[in-house]
Every structure is written in structure tokens, then in C-alpha cells.
Amino acid sequence: NNPICVEVETKALLESLDRVSVVISEKLKSPVRCLFDADRVYLSARTGNGEAKDICPISGDGQQLEIGFNNRYLMDALRYAPADKVKMQLNTGISPCIITPVDGGDEFLYMVLPVRLKAQ
């Protein structure tokens, strides 16, 4: 039961995640902080290598939900999703994100677990 539902172009979100992930490495791991807002998601990551930020357009209202993800897990789910646009169903910053096709088909369903974020 996820009250927050947004739609996003798979390629656009993958590209945003890729740009933000440049500061993340095997030695310097950090979650990607996602702030879902109305019509956009703000992505950021901070490590000893520096800080990276990006914005990706979405359809829907993320209700200011802030959630962290391991960049690899979220990127893998999006990379293997056989759809140009996906639906992300969210609830809280500590509950899983469910990724499904926008058209309502049942070709895939990915569940990505969040990472607890430290206060900024």
C-alpha cells in the first residue's frame, strides 16, 4: 500500500543517477539521496570525492518524500526494466520502492530497498 506514485522516463532517471554516482566508489560509498517533489526528483550524493547533484523530471507529486538508495541497486532495476517509462510507488523513507511498468503490464516488478540517510 504505497500512497505516493510517480512516473518517470527510465533513461532520464538512469542518466541522472549516473551523473550523481561519479562521486561514489567502492572505497567511498554513500547512498543517493532522492527528494521527490512535484514534477521532479532531486538527486544528490556526497563522499570524500566531492558532492554531486542533479534533477530529473517526473510525473506526479512526490509529496516531499526523502529517501536514500544504493545507486547500484536502483540503477540495476532501471537498467533491466523493459519499459521506456516506469511507475515508482513509494510510502516512507524507510519502506521499499516498487517499480513497475506504467502501462500496468506484469512484465516486471522490482522492489528496491532504501538505505537509511544521515541527517544533513
Where are these regions (language model features)?
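DNA polymerase processivity clamps
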Residues: N1-Q120
